Each structure stands twice: as C-alpha cells, then as structure tokens.
C-alpha cells in the first residue's frame, strides 16, 4: 500500500514546532523546532523603542523564518518521497492580530511604521487592551446580553476586537493604513495559498463570530470606524475546521520544498488543535494544554453558560459542537519564573552536581512534603486571571511565608496553587451542568514533571491521561490536514477514523490519591476564600498596586518618547 504523509506546524509563544506524520498510523517520522529570533517583545522593539506596561508583541518575520526552517527540518530528517506528502496545516496562539497592507505585507515592514508598536503582532498575552475589553463588556451588557455568557460574562483583553480597538484609539495612522487586520494564522495561510480565506474557528473563538449574526453588532456603539471594519478590514470566506483553506502555490511550494498544489487546511487555535491528537473527537473528556499558560478545552452538544470561560462558541473546536475554552494565564511560566528569578544558588548547584534541571531538583525535594506541611498557599495570578474571573489586572500572591520557608516549599505551593486554579475552573463547569470526568493532558510539563501531574490529579480528584512527548497541536494539524485531503488523496473522510489511527496518547496515567483528598479539600477552601476576597471586589489592593506601578512606568516611558 502506498504511504502518504502530512505536516503539522504548531506556532507557540516562543517557537514553532513541526512534525511529519505517516497518515496510515500517525507515526511521527520527524520533528523540527525553531525559536523566534525576536522572542516575545515586552520591553522594547528591535529598533529600541521602549514599550508600555502589559505589552506582548511578536515580529511577523519570525513566523516566516520559523515556518521555512521547521518544514525544511522535518523534510531533511524523514526518508520519504516528498511527492507522497498530501497536505499541511498550522495552529496558532490567539488572538494574535496583525495589520497588513493591500499586498498582505505586515505594516511593521514599512519604514513608516517600524517604530510603532501597533504595527506588530499582538501576542495572545498582550494585556494592554484592558480598557477596551472592559468597555466592550459594558456595551455587550447593554446591547447584546446573549453574547455575555459566550465569553464567560466578561470579554478578555486577549480577544481580537479589544486589541484592534486599541490600535484605532492609540495609533489611528496604523489603523487607517491597514487594508486588513488578520489573525496571524490566517495571514500565514493566505501567504501559502494566495487567497483571502479565514478560519471559522479563529473567528468564532476570539472574534465572537456567530452564525446568523456575524461579528458582534455592538461594535458600532464602541466606534463607528470599528464597525466599519466588517467586510472591509475584516473580510474573507470562513472555512470550516478540517476543511480545505486552499492549495500550496507554486512559489510557496518551491520556498518550502514541498509539492505544489497540496492541501492547506484551515488554521486552528493551538489548544483546540490538540483534541484530535489526544483522541477527542466529540463530547467526553477535556483536553488540557499545559504549556507556558494552560488551556482547558472540551466539547458539548449544547450551550450551557459557564462562569469565566473565554469562549463557548459553536464550531470553535470541533465541527457541529460547542467548544468550551478556559484556562490559566500562567502555568509552566509560573514555575519557570520561580526557577529563573528566585531559586537560590545552592539549589542550582545541587541540580548541576546531580546532572538534572533545577525543576527536577526542586520537584525531588517537594515530593517529600505532605499536603499543608509548608503552611503556604498561593493565588496563581502571576499573569492575571483568565478563568474564572477573567481579570488581567489581578496579580499573584503567596501567603504564609516565614523565615524558615524553604525553596521547595514555595515551588510546591506554586504547583498546588495551579492545581487549585484548575479545580476552580472544573467546578464552574460542573455547577453549570457540564461534566468533566477526566483530563487528557499535553505539553512538555505533562511528561517532564511527574510530581506536578500527580498533584494535579490529587487536587482535582480526577484521572489524567498523558500524551506522548510530541508537539500535540502539530500532530492534531496533521490529522486535520489528512481529513482535508480526503480518501481520494490518501487521507480520511471522517475525523473519528483519522484520530483513531493517528492520535498520540501515551500509556502514562495518573490516578488521584484518595488519602490526600481531605487535606486538599481543606486547602482548596482556603484558596477559594482568598480567590473571592481578592478577585471579586472585596479588596482591590492588587489593582491599586498595578495602577501605581503602571503610572510610574508610564512616566519613564513618556521621557523616552
């Protein structure tokens, strides 16, 4: 039987990762990764222009370079006939809007705008559009209350239109010069195919597109120019999940070293792309993408409002189902912050002497502790709260430290805090009538930190099923591109069959330890007390401190302008 192959590319926060898979059984024949040269720009632009607080930008050239490098990387490592490659697909963090000119060229490539932050990609964790998000939420309550539960009661600054409105308010010259505002996933797909198609999943997930309604009509109450974007600066045919967005042009095929005319499937949000790779093609378990941040995704046959979800929309995850998206704005980043900023020299030396990472050394020590032994508890809001409060002006807190507190106690408290945050999200779904019986987990931390996974299972009191150590979203895109190609080209016509053959769950399982349930129930109640006190308005000290910090930084920023 002739073998066929597909390529998936996962564009994450810091790097892009590609896989080349055999369609018949999902075997990953090669992998490649390319970090972004400019990384996440939160302090200054490449030209030296300083950035205001809460900015998180990316450079579009990094995406082009990473796509070229990773595709050539997987081709070089795989001993296959390139003519047997039948399709490719890409997933992206979102919302990551980018203003482009009539030729589809990013405005930051134009010398007129290279010093303007608003001409660059706004990364998902760009939280500087908080005012715009809050104002759009107010307008939603007044003019479109049916949309409120679709965004968990409050629109996030991570969504598409708050970021675009920020461009309009703060850089009208960039807004006027833009022919279109595109999700970077749509932009890159259009460059490969030469058309102006858009991904339905990106439009529904972060731009609140609804079938029969379109993009939010309330935009006209925010600013007539914002509403005027629809059909003009936001335009294109919406392509369904796992469908053909276009075909690889001759020029781009030569650039990538691929056959011209192969299928390019619609781009997809990164967390959603993991579901078919984790064997999820319908209602049932939830997928947890455990990366720098976390995203918990599940599908259900009906719409049930859940507090703090970032998106409950039809067709944002799997065709014909409502996708429920929520998560934590810091996850692996939180543990990484502690290691890079706070771990003492003796921990780093011990890790070096044992030839292990600092994370492994801290986990080894933390594993000896019992629940509650450290006397610590934390609110895991180092990057704001995505769910259930949807408030990016909240900040992290560690309570209970003494002069005897040890590094491993803090490290474990951070892991437990992330577990409590996840349990809070799960409880919100359960209260709404959306059951979650198990989590299928992907992301590097899921197989690099067994202690963390066991703690999560103990705290949420549910089993965890772990993916293989692969870039799971990229594998998911190989599955979706195989479906887009169809059986006539050596792919699949049904997603169920494709996922059954190509998914990448491992044999690793974590079952909750019932002996720790009572201790974690008690600690969780303390977490909820702090969560509600600091997060629901009883004490806004976190926001006052952020405002004070922002004011001081704005003064410094103004001096550089």
Residue map of PLM features:
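Phosphate/pyrophosphate-binding loops at sites that engage ATP/ADP/AMP, CoA/4′-phosphopantetheine
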Residues: 67-86, 171-174, 218-231, 254-256, ...
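Conserved phosphate-binding catalytic cores of ATP/NTP-utilizing and phosphoryl-transfer enzymes
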Residues: 1-2, 249-258, 268-285
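Gly/Ser/Thr-rich active-site cleft segment
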Residues: 11-13, 137, 143-269, 379-383, ...
């Amino acid at each position: 039987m002739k073998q066929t192959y597909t390529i998936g590319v996962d564009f994450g926060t810091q790097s892009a990762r590609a896989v080349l898979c055999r369609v018949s059984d999902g075997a990953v024949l090669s992998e490649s990764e390319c970090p972004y040269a400019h990384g996440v720009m939160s302090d200054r632009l490449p030209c030296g222009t300083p950035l205001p607080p809460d900015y998180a930008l990316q450079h579009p050239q990094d995406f082009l370079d990473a796509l070229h490098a990773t595709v050539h990387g997987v081709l070089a490592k795989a001993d296959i006939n390139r003519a047997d490659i039948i399709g490719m697909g890409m997933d992206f963090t979102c919302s990551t809007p980018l203003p482009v000119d009539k030729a589809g060229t990013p405005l930051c490539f134009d010398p007129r705008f290279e010093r303007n932050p608003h001409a660059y990609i706004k990364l998902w964790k760009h939280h500087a559009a908080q005012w715009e998000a809050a104002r759009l939420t107010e307008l939603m309550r007044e003019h479109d209350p049916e949309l409120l539960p679709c965004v968990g009661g409050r629109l996030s600054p991570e969504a598409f239109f708050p970021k675009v409105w920020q461009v309009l308010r703060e850089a009208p010259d960039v807004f006027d010069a833009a022919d279109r505002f595109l999700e970077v996933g749509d932009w890159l797909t259009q460059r490969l195919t030469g058309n102006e198609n858009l991904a339905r999943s990106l439009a529904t997930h972060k731009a609140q597109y609804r079938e029969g309604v379109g993009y939010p009509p309330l935009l006209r109450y925010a600013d007539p120019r914002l509403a005027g974007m629809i059909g003009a600066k936001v335009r294109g045919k919406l392509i369904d999940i796992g469908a053909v967005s276009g075909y690889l042009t001759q020029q781009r095929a030569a650039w990538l070293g691929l056959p011209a005319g192969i299928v390019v499937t619609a781009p997809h949000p990164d967390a959603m792309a993991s579901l078919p790779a984790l064997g999820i093609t319908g209602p049932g378990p939830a997928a947890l993408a455990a990366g720098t941040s976390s995203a918990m995704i599940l599908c259900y046959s009906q719409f049930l409002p859940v507090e703090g979800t970032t998106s409950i929309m039809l067709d944002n995850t799997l065709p014909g189902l409502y996708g429920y998206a929520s998560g934590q704005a810091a996850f692996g980043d939180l543990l990484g912050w502690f290691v890079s900023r706070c771990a003492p020299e003796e921990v780093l030396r011990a890790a070096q002497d044992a030839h292990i990472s600092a994370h492994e050394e801290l986990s080894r020590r933390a594993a000896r502790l019992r629940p509650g032994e450290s006397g610590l508890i934390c609110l895991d809001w180092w990057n704001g709260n995505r769910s259930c409060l949807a408030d990016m002006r909240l900040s992290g807190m560690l309570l209970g430290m003494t002069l005897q507190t040890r590094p491993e106690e803090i490290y474990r408290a951070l892991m437990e805090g992330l577990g409590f945050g996840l349990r809070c999200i799960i409880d919100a779904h359960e209260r709404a009538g959306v059951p979650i019986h198990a989590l299928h987990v992907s992301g590097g931390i899921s197989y690099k930190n067994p202690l963390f996974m066991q703690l999560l299972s103990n705290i949420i009191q549910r089993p965890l099923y772990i993916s293989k150590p692969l870039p799971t979203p990229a594998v998911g895109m190989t599955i979706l591109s195989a479906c887009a190609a169809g059986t006539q080209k050596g792919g699949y016509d049904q997603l169920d069959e494709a996922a059954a053959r190509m998914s990448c769950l491992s044999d690793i399982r974590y079952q909750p330890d019932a002996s720790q349930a009572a201790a974690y129930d008690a600690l969780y109640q303390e977490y909820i007390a702090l969560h509600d006190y600091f997060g629901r308005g009883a004490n806004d000290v976190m926001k006052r401190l952020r405002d004070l910090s922002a004011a001081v930084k704005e003064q410094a920023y103004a001096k550089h302008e």
